[in-house]
Amino acid sequence: MAVTNALCPAKPTKHTPNQGAIIVALLLLLAGGCQWAASSQNTTGAQLYEQGQYSAALQQFQQVVATDPENADGYYNLAATNHRLGNQRRDPNLLAQAESLYNQCLDHQPNHVECHRGLAVLLVDTGRPDRAFDLMKNWAAQNPNYADPLVELARLYEEAGKSDVAKKYLEDAVQRDAGNSRAWLALGNLREQNGDLEQAMRNYQQSLAINNMQPEVSERVAMLSRQISANYESAVAAGQTQIATQPNFQSGTMTR
């Protein structure tokens, strides 16, 4: 049974000390119950969304924000579902609703990565790419030690066909936070697309060293390793290998 608003904590009123302690304990229990219910509803809604049952998913996500009005994921999920339906139906009202919900999500959680991404995509979808780039740049400026804004900004540039600019932002991202597995993964993916397979594999390995719960990245590393070995064997067979330079030499020029 869904948890209703009546079970969610409200602002406590003044009580005697003993009553206050009891009320605080009850409020903590109720808050935990609301958060658990919201999490369950988000999970159910996400499953319905993946199955293409968008109307049913919307109902679940609406229950999330009714149960827990501070739940940023609930607003994001509502926004993403309205966004999908708005694009499918070419309905500007649904897209406007999605934009409002994305902004509500960010009001509750200013560094919500998926919400920034979703809002940026919506702005591009509705003919406002400059606003999308401004959104990400402002987010990055407000969080100078946070790599995710740069990762998402790079993603926008890559989608706009500016891979060189995207690469710069991703290199900045791993400098900003060398412990961000998403940044290393994105940099590896871009380098793989550009044909720099050895460097891409190193970037993937760095991402895995930070977060080893990425089976798809492990598969990419294994595939690239095989491809690099095959390329080397082909080069040897074609007589294209080069003699390594001696120490203190660079391209045949002696250093001092």
What are these regions (language model features)?
Residues Q193, E198-R256:
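Terminal, low-structured helical/coil segments at or just beyond the last alpha-helical repeat
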Residues Q51-Q63, G86-Q104, D125-N138, N143, ...:
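Structural signature of tandem alpha-helical TPR/SEL1-like repeats
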Residues A38-S39, A72-D73, V113-E114, A147-D148, ...:
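Helix-start (N-cap) detector for alpha-helical repeat units in TPR-like alpha-solenoids
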Residues L28-Q51:
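Bacterial Sec signal peptide processing site at the extreme N-terminus
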